[in-house]
Amino acid sequence: MKNRRARCQLAFLLLLFLLVILAALSVSVGSVSLSFQDIQAILSGADRESTAFHILWDIRLPRLLAAALLGGALSASGFLLQTFFANPIAGPFVLGISSGAKLVVALVMILFLGKGLFMGSAAMILAAFAGSMISMGFVLVIARRVRQMSVLVVCGVMISYICSAITDFVVTFADDSNIVNLHNWSMGSFSGTTWDQVRVMTAVVIPVFVLSFCMAKPISAYQLGEEYARSLGVNVKRFRAELILLSSILSACVTAFAGPVSFVGIAVPQLVKRLFGTAKPIVVIPGCFLGGAVFCLFSDLISRTMFAPTELSISSVTAVFGAPVVIWMMIRRKGAQR
């Protein structure tokens, strides 16, 4: 027991250390390098009219916070979905939930921009949430008829392709200016984040994460089976609805602000469980949030510095590091069944 507790404490300290290091690199490294002295002077309020102040305060700090918040949200969303479906390869990207959110956001974005209207953060989140719930509805209908998770995943991928195809069809008939805006968003990126957007995503992500953490005990009971959860007084029907609602809000918030981001929701929860050496939700949920923040900060740093000033899409980088984890999980799972 003491060894397990010590391991969890060390794991949390490691993630916090990596988070601080990556945050420091994120604000200092880029097309324009900023020294520690520059950052210290800017944060103290000196020389607010300088280019360095604009780069740090208006570009890098909001982007840093967005990557951390949305990375944590996506990882937590993945863990909730894996709990709901009782399978480690469930996630918002694989099940087509992110693509559904992307489709509805694209439709609303083209509608707003086509009429010369400003599309605020609230409209983006509501559109993404509607898309997430529609896709989740299709997945749940299929899940009732299909017992094999592999078939459900294939169906989720097909839903993702259908949503992407419809999105491409809609974009074909959109105005050129709308296509540029939609293309930049649909590639997946934390760039262009403003302080107003950071405030909105904080107001959405933090309360939903806290609610998810408060569900740690019923999640722990549910992981041992529905009958066991009922014996402890858990209203399973309401509990499952809450899981769907919370995971959809988190994934919708990510899609609304950063576009579709792949593999974070699948890979990070599994890596966190291995790192902490436990599957207890009271440990894994905050671990997932920290792990997702670290993973997305690292991926964002790679995406904007590897070929600077050209930026890669965030999904390209997360796929490179996340897909091998998923492959390893599937091979390991197949080997365990033999």
Model-derived features with residue positions:
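Alpha-helical transmembrane segments in inner-membrane proteins
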Residues: 1-338
